[in-house]
From Swiss-Prot:
HAMAP family: Ribosomal_uL22_B. InterPro entries: Ribosomal_uL22, Ribosomal_uL22_bac/chlpt-type, Ribosomal_uL22_bac/org-type, Ribosomal_uL22_CS, Ribosomal_uL22_sf. The keyword Disulfide bond does not apply. GO terms for cellular component: cytosolic large ribosomal subunit. It holds the Pfam family Ribosomal_L22. This is Large ribosomal subunit protein uL22. SUPFAM superfamilies: Ribosomal protein L22. The gene is rplV. It comes from Bacillus subtilis (strain 168).
Length: 113
């Protein structure tokens, strides 16, 4: 059985969020929460919130044991980009892309053996 949590249109660049996501993929949820607490990146608290949501979904919806959960899938997709313009010299303007992310975490029960 699998439980899933998704955070859509989060205001962090996918490239930066993937650096943190790579640290926790495939780990047990207790270990993953510890890693996220000690990782000094802006994406860490956001990903931790999604992970805790996935754990809560597993406990509440599917009555799984939280101590027996493993992160089976964890990925970051690109969301819509907010386009802003910054004035530059000689009347020009340059575009600034404020990127967003869709963060997905799937937890499942650890296989026996």
């Amino acid at each position: 059985m699998q439980a899933k949590a998704v955070a859509r249109t989060v205001r962090i660049a996918p490239r930066k969020a993937r650096l943190v996501m790579d640290l926790i993929r495939g780990k047990q949820v207790g270990e993953a929460v510890s890693i996220l607490n000690l990782t000094p990146r802006a994406a860490s608290p956001i990903i931790e919130k999604v992970l805790k949501s996935a754990i809560a979904n597993a406990e509440h919806n599917y009555e799984m044991d939280a101590n027996n959960l493993v992160i089976s899938q964890a990925f970051v997709d690109e969301g819509p980009t907010l386009k802003r313009f910054r004035p530059r010299a000689m009347g020009r303007a340059s575009q600034i892309n404020k990127r967003t992310s869709h963060i997905t975490i799937v937890v499942s029960e650890k296989k026996e053996g």
